[in-house]
Amino acid sequence: KHFLDSLLFASQPEVAGKMVDVGAGAGFPGIVTKIFKPELELTLMEPTGKRVEFLKYACAQLGLTGVEFAKERAEEAARKAWREQFDLASARAVAALPMLAEYCLPLVKVGGSFLAMKGASGEEELAAARGAIRKLGGEYKETRTLHLPGGDTRTLILCKKISQTP
């Protein structure tokens, strides 16, 4: 399931350029996306040292190049050199959308995208996140509903970064 989720994500047209996977965990969707799109410049952002070591090992074993590893909490990284550096920010299974927007949008440069991977609750979370998205310089664009084999539904919520995060 995680692999299929990641492939559906990787096939989206916004997945290009310089991407950050916030809360990279075991590498979904980041590593799978990098395999699918080797030209992607990928940063795997994960605060847990053991997970970062695993991600480094996995990428080395897979022969992946063009991957950076950031042992950072997203909310702290957004105040540092990572702020507004990415064409795309995404996260899977990290937080509810209002908090996820606060983690991801400050990392995206103006003109870039925030693409949130959510389950069936995506639309409900979007209603609660609209104000935060606007305050952070984002604009909601669309919700994409995807269907996995076996009947599971996934929701991708696309926001564009239209102004700098205050």
Task: Map each language-model feature to its residues.
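S-adenosylmethionine
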Residues: K37-T43, P47-P166
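Hydrophobic side chains within alpha-helical segments
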Residues: D5-L8, A24, F54
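Conserved SAM-binding loop of SAM-dependent methyltransferases across substrates and taxa
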Residues: A26-E39
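Flexible, charged surface loops at secondary-structure boundaries
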Residues: E14-V15, R83
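Conserved class I S-adenosyl-L-methionine
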Residues: V15-G25
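A generic structural signal for residues located within well-ordered alpha-helices
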Residues: K1-L4, A26-F28, K50
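Conserved AdoMet
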Residues: K1-E14
